[in-house]
Regions:
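Long, hydrophobic, amphipathic alpha-helical segments used as structural scaffolds
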Residues: 43-50, 90, 94-101, 294
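Alpha-helix initiation and N-capping motif
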Residues: 25, 36, 40-43, 54-61, ...
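Generic detection of short hydrophobic beta-strand segments and adjacent strand-loop junctions
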Residues: 14-18, 145-150, 213-216
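Positively charged, helix-rich recognition surfaces that bind polyanionic ligands
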Residues: 4, 12, 170-439
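Gly/serine-rich nucleotide phosphate-binding loop at the start of the catalytic core
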Residues: 1-81
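Acidic carboxylate diad motif detector
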Residues: 58-169, 324
Length: 439
């Protein structure tokens, strides 16, 4: 059952694959090159100002248009947004430097790296349910561009387009991402279970019921097969670069191999995103309370002294494996779906010893600080997997925080720790008034 509230608005994203003709492709590429040219002009002025120890004096897009006639064919709002976004990135970098973070200077953009430009208005979406071939997106200075039709939800068609970004992928495919203001839509949960999740490099996560992430082994085998193909293509490309007698023939072969490799990268990304979207929705639909550990993913990916028997490499950097799992994206999608289904998400403090405390008697085992110990053996007779035990303790602690449930197994050191963040999206009060203000 879906409930739609008129007063509250929400901004959602819609990504469409464009199908432009040859003339429209040239215009899209011209906009990309013009925005890249203006961006490089601002980078040059910024670096000069740093060397001369002065404030940068940026030219407006109108002045640049007067100096360079080829910029007059591009849409004015896209050129204006380049300066705005450039200033915003510098502002963010300054705030990071003030906090002590290491941030490098801005760099020039090449044709390979620069792949998107921005619209703020005048973009229109026309979708014909009866004849999908007549569906198009109107883009200023480009015209009506057809897109790869899929079943678009009615909330997107009735919403208001706020901003738009046109992007060219590394495989040469043009995509448009729209930010649309729509009415908030709430859905009802199927079950009201409570669950704790402990992340794992091998199984994605282990929950408080002892189950692992569903169908993750098949997804992981598919990703590994893609990764082997990518590695073989990378070796071929590197050999072509080193042994280049006939440069023209080699460049054509290299281009084909790089396109093939980039398509595999996109397939890997699509498999990951699709799995995480379905998994996060399933968890929020069947659980009321979700307990998680607040992980510092940036620190975990940089650690080189992490010896984990779950993975094949020992003592190496696990940044690649953590990046493949995409835990940060999973947490973002979990919060988005929790707002839709009205869940409660508790992030437990990362210093809480969830893997050291026995979930049955509460005795603390300091030997479990060593990550190589995968099973906890307690004097009470409890022999349990490390991740399963940690998930149970995370759930018990979160129930103590939210519902004030007392557990004797956690009373010894419970006062020392606190929940890092508790997100309550429950709508118990709002649902009582649905007959008055809800459709």
């Amino acid at each position: 059952m879906k409930l739609e509230k008129q007063s509250e608005k929400n901004i959602k994203g819609l990504v469409l694959t464009l199908r432009p003709d040859n003339a429209q492709k040239l215009l899209l590429d011209k906009h990309l090159n013009d925005t890249r040219f203006i961006y490089n002009q601002y980078v040059e002025e910024y670096l000069k100002a740093i060397k001369e120890n002065r404030f940068p004096e940026y030219k407006d897009y109108k002045e640049l248009r007067a100096e360079h006639e080829f910029l007059k064919d591009s849409y004015a709002w896209t050129l204006q947004q380049v300066l705005y976004r450039f200033k915003q990135t510098n502002k963010i970098n300054r705030s990071k430097r003030s906090k002590g973070q290491k941030v490098g200077l801005v760099k020039f953009r090449s044709k390979k790296s620069h792949s998107d430009y921005f619209y703020t208005r005048a973009v229109k979406l026309s979708y014909n349910l009866d004849c999908k071939s007549k569906s198009y997106v109107y883009i200023p200075k480009i015209g009506n561009v057809k897109f790869l039709c899929k079943n678009i939800k009615s909330e997107f068609l009735n919403g208001k387009i706020k901003t738009c970004t046109v992007k060219r992928t590394k495989t040469g495919v043009y995509k448009i991402s729209l930010l649309i203001e729509v009415n908030k839509v709430y859905e009802e949960r199927v079950d009201n279970n409570h669950i704790g999740l402990d992340f794992s490099l091998r199984d994605f996560f282990v929950d408080s019921f002892g189950a692992k992430a569903p169908e993750f082994s098949t997804k992981r085998s598919k990703l590994e097969s893609f990764q082997k193909k990518i590695d073989s293509l990378n070796t071929l490309i590197s050999k072509m670069r080193n042994k280049s007698k006939n440069k023209r023939k080699v460049s054509v072969k290299m281009y084909r191999k790089t396109i093939k490799r980039n398509k595999l990268y996109e397939r890997v990304h699509n498999v990951q995103i699709d799995y995480i979207n379905k998994l996060s929705r399933y968890l929020c639909k069947h659980n009321e309370l979700i307990a998680l550990e607040n992980l510092n993913l940036a620190e975990m990916s940089e650690r080189t002294s992490y010896n984990d028997p779950e993975t094949s490499s020992k003592g190496g950097n696990h940044g690649k494996s953590i990046g493949l799992l995409q835990w940060s994206y999973f947490l973002n999608k979990l919060e988005q779906n929790a707002e839709k289904f009205g869940n409660i998400i508790v992030y437990v403090d990362k210093y809480f010893p969830s893997s050291q405390i026995c979930s049955k008697c509460g005795e603390r085992h300091s030997e479990m600080k060593d990550v190589t110990n995968r099973t906890l053996e307690c004097k009470c007779g409890n022999i349990i997997d490390r991740d399963y035990n940690s998930a149970i303790n995370l759930l018990k602690f979160s129930e103590f925080v939210v519902y004030n449930k007392s557990y004797q197994t956690l009373e010894k050191g419970l006062s020392e720790y606190k929940a890092f963040k508790c997100l309550d999206f429950s709508r118990s009060k709002a649902l009582k008034l649905q007959s008055e203000i809800w459709l």
